[in-house]
């Protein structure tokens, strides 16, 4: 269908090609062209800013970023979303790059601790490898919400090596490595219909 018109012979031909080769489908029937579910942050104003609807929130199949200064409530928003996600049957994967997640904060929201997978790691190479290996264990349709806390703490193995060797140099590879990981997260969420919240200190810190 094109607008209110029926599909043209060409669009039908290309749709058939896409389906036959398992590349895709027309947008009307594409499973990747629709958001199947939203996870509420339990804050109407935040839901509205994310999804343009006060009752929706985090779109499943996409990743969102919560960016702002320290102590601005980013982690609290993520925790509220975790609680709602578990009520909806989601397993939580908590990527703890700040090594700051404590059992007590999850107990405070009455979360199911056994259904939160804690992944404490900060090196980008390690996160990338673990994320892609975990993605192989997840089936399409599995309910998974990834929380990355936080992007600002991501470092490279070079950063660690330089620190060990006492080198006071800026690692220029970090921005590119961060963007590479972000791309993998976005693609994996889209393909497997997972949700992801990436916490960041500032929007410019990418």
Please place each PLM-identified region on the residue numbering.
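Short, Lys/Arg-enriched N-terminal segments with co-localized hydrophobic residues
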Residues: 1-6
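The Walker A/P-loop phosphate-binding site
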Residues: 7-116, 131-136
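P-loop NTPase motor core
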Residues: 121-206
């Amino acid at each position: 269908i094109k607008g209110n018109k029926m599909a043209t012979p060409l669009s039908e031909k290309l749709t058939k090609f896409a389906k036959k080769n398992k590349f895709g489908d027309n947008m009307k029937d594409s499973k990747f062209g629709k958001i199947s579910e939203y996870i509420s942050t339990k804050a109407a104003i935040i839901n509205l800013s994310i999804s343009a609807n006060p009752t929706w929130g985090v779109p499943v199949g996409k990743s969102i970023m919560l960016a702002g200064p320290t102590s601005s409530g980013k982690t609290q928003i993520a925790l509220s979303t975790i609680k709602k996600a578990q009520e909806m049957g989601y397993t939580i994967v908590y990527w703890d790059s700040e090594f700051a997640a404590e059992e007590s904060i999850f107990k405070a929201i009455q979360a199911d601790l056994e259904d939160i997978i804690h992944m404490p790691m900060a090196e980008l190479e390690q996160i990338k490898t673990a994320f892609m290996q975990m993605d192989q264990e997840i089936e399409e349709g599995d309910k998974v919400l990834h929380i990355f806390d936080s992007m600002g703490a991501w470092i490279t193995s070079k950063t660690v090596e330089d620190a060990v060797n006492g080198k006071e140099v800026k690692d220029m590879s970090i921005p590119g490595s961060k963007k590479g990981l972000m791309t993998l997260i976005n693609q994996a969420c889209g393909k497997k219909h997972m949700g992801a919240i990436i916490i960041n200190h500032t929007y410019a810190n990418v």
